[in-house]
From Swiss-Prot:
UniProt name for this protein: FMRFamide-1
Modified residues (Phenylalanine amide): F9
Expression tissues: Detected in the thoracic perisympathetic organs in larvae, and the dorsal ganglionic sheath in adults (at protein level).
An annotated GO BP: neuropeptide signaling pathway
Chief subcellular location: secreted
A single GO cellular-component term on record: extracellular region
Amino acid sequence: SVQDNFIRF
């Protein structure tokens, strides 16, 4: 999901 992409940071 979009939020998962931010969690990588």
